[in-house]
Amino acid sequence: MKQKIIKVGNIDVANDRPFVLFGGMNVLESRDMAMRVVETYVEATTALNIPYVFKASFDKANRSSIHSYRGPGLEEGLRIFEEIKNTFNVPIITDVHEPSQAAPVAEVVDVIQLPAFLSRQTDLVKAMAETNAVINVKKAQFLAPHEMKHIITKFNEAGNDNIILCERGSCFGYNNLVVDMLGFSTMKETGYPVIFDVTHSLQKPGARSDSADGRRSQVVQLGLAGMSQGIAGLFLESHPDPANAKCDGPCALPLHQLKAFLSQMKQMDELAKSFDIIDTE
């Protein structure tokens, strides 16, 4: 299968190109923290020559508790995103949860993300497709890798071919996720770029009284395993103080470890893509 190249600004995203980092923070906690996080990412990716797209959510609409922090909301979130783009000249990815959010978000950011829990919602898919933006499709925890073709078809038939696929783990019993490494090659067979959300794959959903737990201590091992599959990109969330993060702190990479972590991911990506392809059919 010929591998498609999806353009995000001036960045080529493809399974046979050097990996692209989609990284930042889980949710916008404040303007100042967002600026600090993106500055750290820009410094690290520039030093390592890694193409970079900033990630953050303006609203976490699927929290375990109604009392949990959700974010600044659409209007303030887009204002912060505009400031980040103007200051750092980086593309941005963020998620939408309702059809009405797709158009205004697509006017500001470069990639709009279809959340895993909502990946089969046809009205949301159609609204996102109609923006003509690049779409990052999170694979739902309850879907098999080969079922992503149905979501791709929905987007295609709604007029959008600018698609990236994202692995984020699969349900393994209660309160646990696992990543099936065979799923990467299955999704790559579509020709679309595949990226790996290592952060959310470390989640233990519902494992705490009112929020998800996580396994941050294993982020390097899981990241290297994913990058060994020769994929288009890595999706990563970091935090200056994970223990006090307002969402998914147990999964977040400590911000001060970012450059060292990315250095290892880049080495694995380069190694994986240096091998000759062996046809075992």
UniProtKB/Swiss-Prot annotation:
Question: What is an example of a GO molecular function annotated in this UniProt entry?
Answer: 3-deoxy-8-phosphooctulonate synthase activity
Known EC number: 2.5.1.55
Give start-end of the signal peptide. Answer: none
- Quote the cellular component terms of the Gene Ontology held in the record: cytoplasm
- Xref: SUPFAM superfamilies: Aldolase
Pathway it acts in? Carbohydrate biosynthesis; 3-deoxy-D-manno-octulosonate biosynthesis; 3-deoxy-D-manno-octulosonate from D-ribulose 5-phosphate: step 2/3; Bacterial outer membrane biogenesis; lipopolysaccharide biosynthesis
Q: Where in the cell is it found?
A: Cytoplasm
Q: Which domain of life is it from?
A: Bacteria
What keywords would UniProt list here? Cytoplasm, Lipopolysaccharide biosynthesis, Transferase
Q: What is its main location?
A: cytoplasm
The reaction(s) this protein catalyses: D-arabinose 5-phosphate + phosphoenolpyruvate + H2O = 3-deoxy-alpha-D-manno-2-octulosonate-8-phosphate + phosphate
Could you give a single Gene Ontology term from the biological process aspect? Answer: keto-3-deoxy-D-manno-octulosonic acid biosynthetic process
Regarding protein family, the annotation reads: Belongs to the KdsA family.
The record's NCBIfam families line, in alphabetical order, gives: KDO8P_synth (TIGR01362), PRK05198.1 (NF003543)
- Please identify the protein, giving its name as recorded: 2-dehydro-3-deoxyphosphooctonate aldolase
